[in-house]
């Protein structure tokens, strides 16, 4: 791909001259792998998460997040001009308290609640309490955003991440991962329902106002994802070493 397209092609943002069938193929492959309707490619994980959070919420919305979320999430939260509440790491009882507070606010503002956590927390290595958080959807109305940068490719039967590992993949509204961990590459993606992802395509500033992911990385990531899907021995070897 590098010889064919060079290191910079395509030039321009995805919405302009930066789209290609390869970008679209990678998005379809990622969506199928993590069991979501649609996906959007991001140039970098840090920049991508920050921009996704900014695009998802406005001043009427409330964000509730785990205290050990990655710095990229924290910086995304700093852009939020509405309310945000933190709960102690994996403390579900305190999360309930924060959801109660958030629910009262959005009843007045007409907004929504976004809960943000991680699949595998990078500093501690433990998993987010995804199954317990999903249970709370029975009593509270919120969307769940999971940064599974460390779980993608390493957790779950197929490597689809911690949602698959805990049996709640379908209940994750927005699934994010970078390509920098299990795929040893550059770039990232976020997956979810088609209407949410389509909305992001027109609102996510880090992609609208930047050139798209270069073709050698896109084609390479298609191959690397194929290796994750079709060569489980790599994941199995990782766990043997661990």
What kind of region is each of these model predictions?
Residues 3-44:
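Conserved N-terminal alpha-helix of the aminotransferase class I/II PLP-enzyme fold
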Residues 222, 239-242:
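Conserved glycine-rich beta-strand-loop-beta hairpin in the small C-terminal domain of fold type I
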Residues 174-176, 183-232:
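Conserved core segment of the aminotransferase class I/II
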Residues 52-71:
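Conserved PLP-anchoring active-site segment centered on the Schiff-base-forming lysine
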Residues 140-142, 161-179, 198, 202:
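Conserved active-site segment immediately N-terminal to the catalytic lysine
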Residues 85, 89-146:
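Active-site phosphate-binding strand-loop segment of PLP-dependent enzymes
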């Amino acid at each position: 791909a590098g010889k064919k397209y060079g290191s910079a092609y395509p030039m321009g943002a995805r919405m302009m001259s930066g789209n290609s069938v390869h970008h679209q193929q990678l998005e379809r492959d990622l969506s199928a792998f993590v069991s979501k309707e649609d996906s959007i490619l991001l140039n970098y994980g840090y920049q991508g998460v920050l921009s996704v959070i900014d695009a998802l919420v406005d001043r009427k919305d409330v964000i509730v997040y785990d205290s050990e979320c990655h710095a990229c999430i924290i910086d995304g939260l700093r852009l939020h001009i509405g309310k945000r509440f933190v709960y102690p790491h994996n403390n579900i009882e305190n999360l309930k308290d924060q959801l109660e507070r958030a629910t009262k606010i959005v009843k007045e503002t007409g907004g929504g609640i976004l809960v943000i956590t991680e699949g595998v927390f990078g500093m501690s290595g433990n998993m987010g309490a995804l199954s317990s958080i999903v249970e709370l959807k029975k009593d509270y109305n919120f969307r769940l955003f999971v940064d599974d940068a460390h779980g993608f490719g390493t957790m779950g039967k197929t490597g689809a991440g911690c949602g698959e590992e805990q049996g709640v993949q379908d209940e994750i509204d927005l699934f994010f991962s970078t390509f920098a961990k299990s795929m040893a590459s550059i770039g990232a993606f976020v997956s979810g329902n088609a209407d949410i992802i389509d909305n992001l395509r027109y609102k996510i500033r880090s992609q609208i106002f930047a050139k798209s992911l270069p073709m050698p990385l896109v084609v390479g990531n298609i191959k690397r994802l194929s290796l994750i899907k079709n060569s489980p021995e790599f994941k199995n070897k990782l766990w043997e070493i661990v």
